[in-house]
Amino acid sequence: MKRIVLFTFTMLLGIFCYAQSEHLKFSGIPIDGTINQFQAKIVQKGYVYNKLYSEAISNGVRYFDGTFVGNKVGLYVYYDEQIKKVYRVKAVINNISEELADQKYQMIQQLLQRKYEDCYFQEDKKENKPSLTIYASRYELPSEEEPIWKECFGRIDIFISQNETIYNYPYIYNVHIDYWDQINTDKHENKLLDEL
């Protein structure tokens, strides 16, 4: 009897530990590993590293050009500068009309809701446009309850923003699809807190 209990406990502990180490995925790639490891995987998916633009933006971000869900996008990969660990990936559909931005948002929102149907959704508005946050949970969360960040693989934000470089009508818009891995985001934020 002791062996059965010990075996069951060991199996449950192994499953629990495995669940705690899972990462959110972008295009089937876990948001984990060093920036160089992640870059090698994303390049295999057809993304092209844009060195010039990467050097022009802030430290801890690399920029790629590619295609995401049938759309040309700019891909921003965020990583911790000291340990080079990836924690966030954002695809941006740039410079499109308001009508097209609304259509792209609706299409991607529906696809994400279908893929993550058992997860917690939080709808809101950003810049008078709809926005959606999906908490990709380790297990199903009751829809009435607020999500607990520790119980999630991470979160995915999708929203529309007006392009700030165009000041005259007709305005140009961008659609953002922003993936945050919970485990590595926590590590990155804890390192920042330790510096204070």
Report each predicted region and the residues it spans.
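Sec-dependent N-terminal signal peptides
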Residues: 4-19
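Residue-level signal for well-ordered alpha-helical segments
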Residues: 15, 24, 54-56, 63-68, ...
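Non-cytosolic coordination micro-motifs
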Residues: 20-57, 93-196
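Mid-chain, structured segments of secreted extracytoplasmic proteins
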Residues: 62-108
